[in-house]
């Protein structure tokens, strides 16, 4: 059994929203927060986010992006990270009760998302659906 903290050099946690995305870069296996930032959810903002992560991680493509809402608000960022060569996973379900009374902010949520992925086995990661084949064709038909 190999957990994320032992097999990945970095985990990038993302709290995705309609207008902005908060990112936190954690070093594995310690979980040390290397840096945090927020970017607009625009095409230029997504490109800046991917470039920012590349600078923080030495462009190590073994880094794992853990994104909240890869099927909704985080979909475009997930696609941008995957297109850059990074592995992407959906954020694990979090225990709200464990975080009660600690505070809530987007950067803090991004950090918690990354921390929640560290002890997971790779088989427990929820991978995003691919946007290819029949799925892409149906999306085009529905949009027209």
List the predicted regions and their residue ranges.
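Phosphate- and other anionic-substrate recognition elements at nucleic-acid/protein interfaces
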Residues: 1-144
């Amino acid at each position: 059994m190999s957990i994320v903290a032992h097999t990945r050099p970095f985990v990038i946690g993302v709290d995705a929203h309609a207008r902005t995305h908060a990112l936190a870069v954690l070093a594995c296996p310690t979980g040390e927060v290397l840096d945090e930032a927020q970017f607009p959810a625009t095409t230029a903002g997504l490109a800046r986010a991917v470039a920012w992560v590349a600078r923080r991680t030495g462009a190590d493509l073994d880094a794992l992006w853990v994104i909240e809402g890869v099927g909704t608000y985080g979909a475009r960022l997930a696609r941008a990270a995957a297109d850059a060569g990074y592995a992407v996973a959906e954020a694990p379900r979090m225990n709200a009760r464990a975080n009660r009374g600690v505070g809530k902010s987007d950067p803090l949520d991004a950090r918690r998302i990354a921390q929640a992925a560290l002890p997971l086995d790779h088989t427990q990661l929820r991978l995003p659906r691919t946007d290819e084949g029949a799925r892409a064709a149906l999306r085009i038909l529905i949009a027209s």
